[in-house]
Design a protein with these regions (language model features):
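Catalytic histidine-centered segment of alpha/beta-hydrolase-like enzymes
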Residues: 250-259, 263
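Flexible "cap/lid" loop of the alpha/beta hydrolase fold
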Residues: 114-119, 123-161
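Active-site loop/oxyanion-hole signature of alpha/beta-hydrolase fold enzymes
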Residues: 19-22, 27, 64-104, 264
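Conserved alpha/beta-hydrolase catalytic His-Asp/Glu region
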Residues: 137-140, 158-213
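Short beta-strand/loop motif that positions the catalytic acidic residue
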Residues: 212, 218-220, 224
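Gly/Ala-rich beta-loop-alpha elbow adjacent to hydrolase catalytic centers
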Residues: 105-113
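Conserved HGGG/HGGXW glycine-rich cap/lid loop of the alpha/beta-hydrolase fold
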Residues: 22, 27-72
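Alpha/beta-hydrolase fold catalytic core
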Residues: 1-36, 57-60, 98-99, 125, ...
């Protein structure tokens, strides 16, 4: 983890709390009357939100957690879904006195905010999503066939594993199967976190968007292939008070690639809360 700097130029405050059965690492920095929560994407950690924090640290108190299973935080005590992650972040906000706050979330972080914004609207004053995950991509015919083939082979190998003397060979076959059919994110995880990953990405959060009460700004790269622009447009339709800004040429990490523009837009949206 990097060294975070607070408004005095000294060492930032890096802390941990035991929440929901695991250690949650988070950083507090910045100054000002406003409170700003920054949430990273899957497979990353809070360091990837630092460029955003730097742009707001002179006007906001900023909270940047590492999600359980990421960065310096411990793993979930059992496979978690979006709801468990949302509960964890809600408790962190309450225990650190960060209610209400503004929030800027990227990718997986948007899943967490979506659940919280719909079920605990008092938590957020304003919301910014960038490359937000939460809407399931429809499977193409080819992808559907590939998924079905994977499930059949997996079931077959699991059956082999129950036969005496075949367990080791079956495990090796399953491992090769995962590497062939699993995504890069999936294959990078250990067995415990794979179960969490599957639970998280299998949930479609469309039903939550109409229940948002906070004003929401969606900032999207038009070249995003992970969470394509049509997802941002769909969220704009479903969230009652939402607007969409498109960053031309921006990928899933447009907020980093076009940091100056992203931060300018975000600052304009949040300036009344500083």
């Amino acid at each position: 983890m990097p060294v975070y700097l607070d408004d005095s130029g000294g060492a930032g405050r890096m802390m941990t709390k035991n929440i929901c059965g695991t250690e949650v690492s988070y950083t507090l920095q910045g100054s000002g009357k406003g409170k700003l929560l920054l949430l990273h994407g899957w497979g990353c950690d809070g360091r990837l939100m630092q460029s955003v924090a730097n742009a707001f640290a002179d006007r906001f108190q900023i909270l940047i957690p590492d999600f359980p299973g990421h960065g310096n935080s411990g793993k979930p005590p059992e496979p978690w879904g979006v709801q468990e992650y949302a509960d964890c972040i809600r408790i962190l906000l309450e225990e650190t006195g960060f209610v209400p706050c503004c929030v800027i979330a990227h990718s997986f972080g948007c899943r967490i905010v979506s659940v919280l914004a719909a079920t605990y609207p008092q938590l957020f004053v304003k919301i910014i999503f960038t490359g937000g995950a939460g809407i399931r991509k429809p499977l193409s015919d080819e992808a559907q066939k590939r998924t079905e083939h994977y499930k059949k082979l997996k079931g077959l190998y699991e059956s082999f594993g129950k036969i005496p003397l075949m367990h080791s060979a079956a495990e090796k076959m399953e491992d090769r199967l995962r590497k062939k059919y699993g995504s890069a994110d999936y294959n990078a995880l250990d067995e415990e976190m794979r179960k969490t990953f599957v639970k998280v990405i299998s949930q479609d959060l469309t039903e939550y968007y109409p229940h948002f009460q906070a004003s929401t700004l969606l900032i999207w790269g038009d070249a995003d292939t992970e969470t394509p622009l049509w997802m941002g447009k769909k969220m704009e339709e479903l969230i009652p008070d939402a607007g969409l800004v498109i960053l031309e040429g921006g990928s899933h990490f447009a907020y980093l690639e076009q940091a100056a523009r992203f931060n300018l837009i975000a600052n304009h949206f949040l300036k009344e809360e500083a």
